[in-house]
Regions:
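Phosphate-handling substructures
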Residues: 1
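Active-site core segments that coordinate phosphate-bearing ligands/cofactors
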Residues: 4-36, 41, 46-64, 81, ...
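A conserved helix-loop-beta module that forms one wall/lid of the active-site cleft
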Residues: 64-75
């Protein structure tokens, strides 16, 4: 959608664009390497052929996005290259650093939590509350589609992941702060305290009956 927005609303920028990159491949490019996007992250663009592990010519054709405007793709953990000495010296890194592809945040978190087998899952709390299960085979059914559940490459080659999430994590706390906590924000700025510490000071010991359903 973001690429199409540029194509439809900023056609001059679109025509001058060399590559559309995500975070991992942009960092690779800035480190002087030919960028490669992990299958895990590329799937989130909705332009990856998940089963074949490469860009979908059919989807790119429908969108009118040339394949050469996207980076190469590879499995997570694929070696991209070694940071050139000149770049390493310029930014204060030791020479000889090897860079590899990464992955989408939730499957990467699952890997870090030791979720390596089909049928296992990790529960993560951050911007959102998210459950990320791992599968042995690619599976999209009427039930998963109805539940808005995706299936895409995990950060472990040969396995797949899904994500079930709700916007009740840190993003909801930020919304509350920005919407209702103007006085607390001023107090935090004056005292040097964290605004969330000030908010926590006013929280009663027992849960309240008021609930927020973040469907907005």
């Amino acid at each position: 959608n973001k690429v199409l927005w540029f194509k439809q609303n900023q056609p001059d920028i679109f025509k001058r664009t060399w590559k559309f990159l995500c975070y991992e491949d942009f960092v690779q490019h800035r480190l002087g390497l030919d960028p490669i996007m992990s299958h895990s992250l590329a799937a989130r663009t909705m332009a990856l052929d998940v089963r074949k592990g490469g860009w979908s010519d059919e989807l790119l054709g429908i969108a009118g996005v040339p394949r050469e405007m996207l980076p190469r793709t590879a499995a997570s953990g694929t070696v991209v290259g070694t940071v050139p000495d000149s770049v390493a010296d310029d930014i204060g890194l030791p020479r000889g650093i090897v860079v590899s592809t990464g992955g989408h945040d939730q499957p990467a978190g699952a890997l870090g939590a030791g979720i390596l087998e089909s049928g296992e899952a990790v529960y993560a709390t951050g911007t959102v509350d998210c459950i990320c299960p791992i599968y042995k085979t690619y599976s999209v059914t009427e039930q998963t589609v109805a539940g808005n559940l995706c299936c895409y490459p995990s950060c472990v080659p040969g396995l797949y992941a899904s994500i079930a999430f709700n916007f009740t994590g840190g993003s909801l706390l930020k919304w509350y702060r920005d919407t209702f906590a103007a006085e607390e924000c001023r107090s935090a700025a004056e005292s040097g305290r964290d605004v969330y510490e000030i908010l926590c000071d006013s929280v009663p010991a027992a849960p309240e009956k008021l609930l927020i359903l973040p469907h907005f």
